[in-house]
């Protein structure tokens, strides 16, 4: 099988894997409202945190990251070049953003993109996670944390393993474009902050 054929097959496989909406499936399994219809309307871990609590959000985060990590890492093991790895990672993110199995209404692609970056190395994964967590704790804005972490990701990659700077920059660009509306709301002071589902008070 030629390298081009293998790359195209992995792009299709990555898109299909990305199209499995973890947020919708976890909410269905746990008897929670459809995240596309509740909260921010975004089927991602942050919105599931709002409507279903931390454990449900953690499950969504794990599976969303896995959707990006698995096809990208498999392609790396197959010897596919760095630029093609970036295209495969973008395909997984586009599956998450425009899922064929869920009416093409998906999330922002942040967890899937960061999952695709994580196999580059533990050090990069730690830098990305630490940046996002610190920024969320400081600002309370998940979107702002994602945007700034996406901007930092190519710099981290260039510093740690410059072979993958271009594909990571491709993913970062996609994340920022996907957050265009969030950027506008942040500038207007209208963006929602991160909050957990409130537990009912005991009688």
UniProtKB/Swiss-Prot annotation:
It is an enzyme of class 2 (transferase). It is found in: Cell inner membrane. The keyword Ribosomal protein does not apply. Disulfide bonds: none annotated. GO terms for biological process: phospholipid biosynthetic process. GO terms for cellular component: plasma membrane. Its EC number is 2.3.1.275. It comes from the Bacteria. HAMAP family: PlsY (MF_01043). NCBIfam families: glycerol-3-phosphate 1-O-acyltransferase PlsY. Catalyzes the transfer of an acyl group from acyl-phosphate (acyl-PO(4)) to glycerol-3-phosphate (G3P) to form lysophosphatidic acid (LPA). This enzyme utilizes acyl-phosphate as fatty acyl donor, but not acyl-CoA or acyl-ACP. Belongs to the PlsY family. This is Glycerol-3-phosphate acyltransferase.
């Amino acid at each position: 099988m030629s390298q081009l054929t293998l790359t195209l097959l992995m792009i299709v496989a990555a898109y299909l894997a990305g199209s499995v909406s973890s947020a919708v499936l976890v909410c269905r399994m746990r008897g929670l409202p459809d995240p596309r219809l509740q909260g921010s309307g975004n089927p991602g871990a942050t919105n599931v945190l709002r409507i279903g609590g931390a454990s449900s959000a953690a499950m969504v985060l794990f599976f969303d990251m896995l959707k990006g990590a698995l096809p990208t890492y498999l392609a790396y093991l197959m010897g596919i070049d760095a630029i093609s790895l970036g295209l495969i990672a973008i395909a997984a993110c586009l599956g998450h953003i425009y899922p064929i199995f869920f009416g093409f209404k998906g999330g922002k692609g942040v967890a899937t993109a960061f999952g695709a970056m994580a196999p580059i190395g533990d050090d990069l994964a730690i830098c990305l996670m630490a940046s996002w967590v610190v920024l969320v704790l400081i600002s309370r804005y998940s979107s702002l944390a994602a945007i700034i972490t996406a901007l930092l990701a190519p710099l981290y990659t260039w510093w740690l393993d410059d072979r993958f700077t271009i594909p990571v920059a491709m993913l970062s660009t996609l994340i920022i474009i996907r957050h265009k509306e969030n950027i506008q709301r942040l500038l207007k002071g209208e963006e929602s902050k991160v909050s957990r589902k409130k537990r009912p008070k005991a009688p």
